[in-house]
Design a protein with these regions (language model features):
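Glycine-rich phosphate/nucleotide-binding loop
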Residues: 53, 62-66, 186-196
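Active-site "cap" helix and flanking loop/linker of ATP-utilizing ligase/carboxylase catalytic domains
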Residues: 77-99, 116-189, 194
């Protein structure tokens, strides 16, 4: 906008409502006709502690999201997920795969920020860590249009994921650094790699 820094895309400005509040992620596995909701998760996008610094893809996440009370969960189902999934079916665009809704909660009101046709990162890791069923079996059931008679088993435990990033992330960051991790004998601790 200023001095043409953004080129053609900076010539038009779109003003939107500023919304504020905690952001949560809700995922559904869909087979084109039916869908199964996964537990909620909440990630933290700022690079520094106490919600400071630049936004990132996510510096950590936990599941379930404590802000998702029974009341909020019902609102999410009835105001967002059911209308979306049923709308896709009614319009002749049934969806097969994982659908991810990024939502913001403010004063018990739900605002939809985005929908993605994928899992979210880093929210997926804490969610899947709570899964007692086979992810491969779930995906195969979705492909075969057989989700209606399946019940996913989840642990009641809470799960947390922490991202460790190179110095300087998310801007110019160090690369080609050795990562050393002591042997992990704790079954409640899993290590996931990305960009290593």
């Amino acid at each position: 906008i200023i001095n043409g820094k953004f080129g053609e895309s900076g010539k038009i400005v779109l003003l939107e409502e500023k919304i504020d509040g905690p952001e949560i992620s809700i995922f559904a596995l869909c087979d084109g006709k039916k869908y199964i909701l996964l537990p909620s998760a909440q990630d933290h996008k700022r690079v520094k502690e106490n919600d400071k610094g630049l936004n990132t893809g996510g510096m950590g996440a936990y599941s379930p999201a404590p802000i998702v009370t029974d009341e909020i969960h019902e609102k999410i189902l009835n105001q967002v997920m059911y209308p979306t999934m049923n709308g896709l079916i009614e319009e002749g665009s049934p969806y097969l795969g994982f659908l991810y809704a990024g939502l913001m909660i403010k004063d018990s009101e739900i605002k939809v920020l985005e929908f993605n046709c994928r899992f979210g990162d880093p929210e997926t890791q804490p969610i899947l860590f709570r899964l007692n069923s086979s992810l491969v079996e779930l995906c195969n059931l979705a492909i075969d249009d057989k989700l209606d008679n399946y019940s996913i088993e989840w642990t009641e435990k809470h799960s947390c994921g922490v991202v460790i990033a190179s110095a300087g992330y998310p801007e110019k960051y160090e690369s080609n650094k050795e990562v050393s991790i002591k042997e992990n004998n704790n079954e409640d601790l899993k290590l996931f790699h990305a960009g290593t």
